[in-house]
Curated annotation (Swiss-Prot):
Binding-site list for ATP: 66-73
Function in brief: Can catalyze the hydrolysis of ATP in the presence of single-stranded DNA, the ATP-dependent uptake of single-stranded DNA by duplex DNA, and the ATP-dependent hybridization of homologous single-stranded DNAs. It interacts with LexA causing its activation and leading to its autocatalytic cleavage.
Similarity section: Belongs to the RecA family.
Organism in which the protein naturally occurs: Methylophilus methylotrophus
Subcellular localization: Cytoplasm
Gene Ontology biological process terms from the UniProt entry: DNA recombination; DNA repair; SOS response
The protein's name: Protein RecA
SUPFAM superfamilies for this protein: P-loop containing nucleoside triphosphate hydrolases, RecA protein, C-terminal domain
Gene3D superfamilies, sorted: P-loop containing nucleotide triphosphate hydrolases
Entry keyword set: ATP-binding, Cytoplasm, DNA damage, DNA recombination, DNA repair, DNA-binding, Nucleotide-binding, SOS response
InterPro entries registered for this protein in UniProt: AAA+_ATPase (IPR003593), DNA_recomb/repair_RecA (IPR013765), DNA_recomb/repair_RecA_CS (IPR020584), P-loop_NTPase (IPR027417), RecA-like_C (IPR049261), RecA-like_N (IPR049428), RecA_ATP-bd (IPR020588), RecA_C_sf (IPR023400)
Gene: recA
Domain of life: Bacteria
GO molecular function, one term: damaged DNA binding
Length: 342
């Protein structure tokens, strides 16, 4: 670049910084830009690996969606618990009015320190979220759920009134405001969403999420969570087998998937994941129903192997460390088949 151009550029950059503040424009090679992405664990070892960066990225919008009772709230409460372990402040905007403090406590959430809001309208919920983000003092904000963000006009109107597209416009406007503040304050914002069926779809995926398309575009990560089976102890159902697909990922390659168990009253089974992922990497040997580690049997059947690791946390930590060291190998094997709607 010649001297005249360099001087003109320097003058323009100086004027921009003077008018809009320091850091409003910078070169990609500057030190501040190259900082490592900060993440918080999801509470699932396999999902952290599938996300490619070790967890959910801060300063971004995350959407978690799936059918009813698929584990959406469990996953977000696990992320809240992980953030609190790091000393972070968490807020839960409960538009569904369905948060169970006792269940949250069982998942490791520090309930007395959790900020909770049960807003009357969608506008109020999103305004509260924006104010919390702008404060810069909250590390994670969860909105549960987008489907329950009812616009004020709909609440104040008659039961049969038509309010076509009102919620979608509300979400679009709110996300335009939120995005910049979320990035500036490095806050992690998670929206839980529900699934609806598109009417008249003959080909392709008839499923869609509520609240219009804005959230799909503004989200850096979109997770599709599904219950794939039941875990039984005799005739009693004690948990559910769960699969999570990374449908969208702006911080790492997408279309990975993770599978884990959600145990009722316990949450995501960390020890179950250690056994499964360890077996996949041949760190844990499986012969018939027996599991072995370093040539020593640790249990017959998965539940007994989990009990062994529960009683021997040092061995569990050792296997987990080896799994993390081989996370690239695991990530390559986690690629999910793309659906027609992805």
């Amino acid at each position: 670049m010649d001297d005249n151009k360099s001087k003109a550029l320097a003058a323009a950059l100086s004027q921009i910084e003077k008018q809009f503040g320091k850091g409003s424009i910078m070169r990609m090679g500057d030190a501040d830009i190259g900082e490592d992405l900060q993440v918080v664990s999801t509470g699932s070892l396999g999902l952290d690996i599938a996300l490619g960066v070790g967890g959910l990225p801060r300063g971004r919008i995350i959407e978690i969606y799936g059918p009813e009772s698929s584990g959406k709230t469990t996953l977000t409460l696990s992320a809240i618990a992980e953030m609190q372990k790091l000393g972070g402040v968490a807020a839960f905007i409960d538009a569904d009015d369905a948060l169970d403090p006792q269940y949250a406590s069982k998942l490791g959430v520090n309930v007395p320190e959790l900020l909770i809001s049960q807003p009357d309208t969608g506008e109020q919920a999103l305004e509260i979220a924006d104010m919390l983000v702008r404060s810069g003092s909250v590390d994670i904000v969860v909105v549960d759920s987008v489907a329950a963000l009812t616009p004020r006009a709909e609440i104040e109107g008659e039961m049969g009134d038509s309010h076509m597209g009102l919620q979608a416009r509300l979400m679009s406007q709110a996300l335009r405001k939120l995005t910049g503040n979320i990035k500036r304050t490095n806050t992690l914002v998670i929206f839980i969403n529900q699934i609806r069926m598109k009417i008249g779809v003959m080909f392709g995926n008839p499923e869609t999420t509520t609240g219009g398309n804005a959230l799909k575009f503004y989200s850096s990560v979109r997770l599709d969570i599904r219950r794939t089976g039941a875990i039984k102890k005799g005739d009693e159902v004690i948990g559910s087998e769960t699969k999570v697909k990374v449908i969208k990922n702006k911080v790492a390659p997408p279309f990975k998937q993770a599978e884990f168990d959600i145990m009722y009253g316990e949450g995501i089974s960390r020890l179950g994941e250690i056994i499964e992922l360890g077996t996949n990497l041949k760190l844990v040997e499986k012969s018939g129903a027996w599991y072995s580690y370093n040539g020593e049997k640790i249990g017959q059947g998965k539940e007994n192997a989990k009990e062994f690791l529960r009683e021997n946390p040092a061995i569990a930590a050792e296997i987990e460390a080896k799994i993390r060291d081989n996370s690239n190998v695991l990530a390559d094997s986690m690629t999910a088949a793309r659906s027609e709607d992805d």
